[in-house]
Curated annotation (Swiss-Prot):
Pfam families: zf-C2HC_2 (PF13913). A zinc finger (C2HC/C3H-type) spans 7-36, 110-139. PANTHER family: C2H2 ZINC FINGER CGI-62-RELATED, ZINC FINGER C2HC DOMAIN-CONTAINING PROTEIN 1A. InterPro entries: ZC2HC1A/B-like (IPR026319), Znf_C2HC_C3H (IPR049899). Residues 208-226 have a biased composition (Polar residues). This is Zinc finger C2HC domain-containing protein 1A. Its cofactor is Zn(2+). One of its GO terms (molecular function) is zinc ion binding. Residues 35-75, 138-273 are annotated as: Disordered.
Length: 323
């Protein structure tokens, strides 16, 4: 083994060891390779030889973009400052002090600012946006020079308005009594206690109750002693004019036996009071100083007056009628 090691000799160019016979062949080849660089072998060209396939040009490798320096330290400091400011604001809100001014906005230095709209974009987005923003700003400038303001709102088209409803003339305005809320059994013939308003034949004076105001009713329905004498209480005018007719009366509100018993028991009235005349059938009206007889039931809604000296109905508010 020692003899073989002594026989090996190193090459002066590459430093490798060879036998003396092999070294003589290696030295001239090593000198050529050191002077002239070896070409890279392209297997694609070798496979394409003898065929119709065109030799593809080798793709040049793209230069690697320079690596950006990481700004992790600056981002870390901004994050810590944001957390501290949030804690300070929460403490001030608990104590009730004045809020400090907001911190200045932080910008990413890697972003590119647009010279037209002053916004910031990534490098790839900025390359597309700046060209578009440049053309848009040029168009807007031409519109302003032409006299059109882009910020001005467009003119609004006139909207169609429907015609207003026709109002009734003062002569056709209904009386206050007709505007009052009516009970559900309004206009239905019922049987029960007779009301002050009676149903008369067509052409009779009793039809004036539905077309005239309460004040006009009082002036037209007062009977004088010379004309026919005062009627007794609770005697309907229709029975006096037509004693043979047994028709039911048109009332605003129906009463049953239970409803009639409650107000009498509460107010202390007796059923015998309905047939007795009040002050011999004559009382003096407080407002117009005319002698007449007061009704015990409202001629509008049929509600019984709770007291003898009531001037208005407690349900519908219509003035009490004097017969």
């Amino acid at each position: 083994m020692e003899e073989t090691e002594e026989e090996l000799r190193p090459c002066k160019i590459c430093g490798r060891t060879f036998f003396p016979a092999t070294l003589k062949k290696h030295v001239p080849i090593c000198q050529k390779t050191s002077v002239k660089k070896r070409k890279t072998f392209e297997s694609s060209r070798q496979r394409a030889e003898g065929t119709d396939i065109n030799t593809v040009k080798p793709v040049k490798p793209r230069p690697e973009p320079p690596k950006k320096q990481s700004n992790w330290k600056r981002k870390h400091e901004e994050f810590i400052a944001t957390i501290r400011s949030a804690k300070g604001i929460s403490q001030i809100l608990k104590e009730g002090g004045e809020l400090p001014p907001p911190p200045p906005p932080s910008y990413d230095p890697d972003y590119v600012q647009c010279p037209y709209c002053q916004r910031r974009f990534n490098q790839n987005a900025a390359d597309r946006h700046i060209n578009f923003c440049k053309e848009q700003s040029a168009r807007m400038g031409q519109k302003i020079k032409g006299g059109t303001d882009p910020k001005r709102k467009p003119t609004v088209r006139p909207q169609y308005k429907p015609p207003s409803l026709k109002t009734d003339s003062p002569a056709a305005v209904s009386s206050p009594a007709s505007r009052l809320p009516q009970p559900p059994n309004f206009g239905k013939p019922t049987s029960g206690i007779p009301s002050g308003k009676s149903v008369a034949n067509s052409g009779a004076p009793g039809n004036k109750y539905q077309t005239q105001s309460p004040a006009h009713k009082n002036s037209t329905m007062v009977t004088s002693p010379q004309a026919g004498g005062a009627l007794k209480a609770r005697t309907p005018p229709s029975l006096v004019k037509n004693p043979s007719s047994g028709t039911s009366f048109n009332k605003r509100k129906t009463y049953n036996a239970e409803n009639n018993a409650r107000p009498e028991a509460a107010m202390g009235y007796d059923s015998s009071d309905y047939s007795k005349p009040l002050n011999d059938g004559h009382i003096r009206a407080a407002d117009n100083n005319m002698s007449g007889q007061l009704t015990k039931f409202c001629h509008e809604c049929g509600t019984k007056y709770p007291v003898e000296w009531a001037k208005f109905c407690c349900e519908c508010g219509v003035r009490r009628m004097v017969l």
